[in-house]
Amino acid sequence: MIKNYPEIIPIFPLGGVIYFPKTNLPLNIFEQRYLDLVNDIYNKDKLMGMIQPQKNNNSFFKVGCLGKITDFQKSKDGRIMINLTGITRFEILNEVKNNKLYKEFKVDYKKFNKDFSSSSYNEEMSSFMIKAKNFFKKNGLLLNWKEFDNLDNGQKINTLAMIAPITNEEKQKLLEAITLKFLGLPKVC
């Protein structure tokens, strides 16, 4: 089920940060263009996209994550601290020209309609979790698995993808995967 999310969204490109649905991302905003972006959306629908810039050029990966501001605090020195809660992934269709300091893009959410259903992962989840636990143990990573079990399947998958000790390019591939079958994390476990 895709809700009526905007087809034109402002984009916050941030290298080294891959952001997933059903996860939270704290951000410290200090550049004027992104202060403008956050102020504009906070007074509107609170929705913005996070996208990974590609290396060595001014383009972006085609898949990012739509998030909603769920916490907003201004500091005395003009910075804004926000928490962004991931909603769904999107695919960039094209840039929309504007007179703003930040970029806006026309996006499509259809490919990622399973972001709204944790039950779509049920069949493969048991095998995936065994492989994920082995992967984390093998890499010396500690995780409170009892607490982790309280998350829904979508949150589990996306949280593991965010915190896994893999490259940003590998995380981007995980973000672009449409279903658990295409995730790739079990292949590296």
Model-derived features: where do they sit?
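N-terminal low-complexity, acidic/polar interaction/targeting segments
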Residues: M1-C189
